[in-house]
Amino acid sequence: MPKWELERTSPGCYLITMEADSPSWHADFLLSSDRHHDNAHTDQRLELTHLLEAQERDAGILDIGDLHCAMQGKWDKRASTDACRPEQREGRYLDSLVDCAAEFYEPFADRWLFMSPGNHEGSILKRHETDLTERTAERLRAKGSPVIVGSYAGF
């Protein structure tokens, strides 16, 4: 059995199965949301510190929405070039969000288990008919990730 087995059990519900090999067995996970990775004010060094710790602890990574900020496109009335990273100022804005995020997260692809969209990604899907979460997950899968893309949900 691989370290993690993932499956969707019903809409909005997902199961991660692992095999315990001793009474003292434990598993670590990095649970994150609202990374807003592409925003100029995001602390990517801290983000990297957390990812490296997940790698060191052999932890799975679960991200539950708004990995992308995606608010700096010319169509968004809230857009501000001050909140835009230099790599997103060169045209192809939506493509650059996926490219930059994938490049940053690919070294951790093998432990990225779950990724779901937040309202930021949902807004892009609604207005521009491109799924940033699925596109980012596809890039991670190309590097061997078992990542499952969840759905937008709340309580």
Residue map of PLM features:
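Short glycine- and acidic-rich boundary segments immediately preceding or forming the N-terminal edge
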Residues: 1-18
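Short, intrinsically disordered, charge-balanced linker/junction segments flanking boundaries
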Residues: 152-155
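Core catalytic region of metal-dependent phosphoesterases/phosphodiesterases
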Residues: 16-32, 37-149
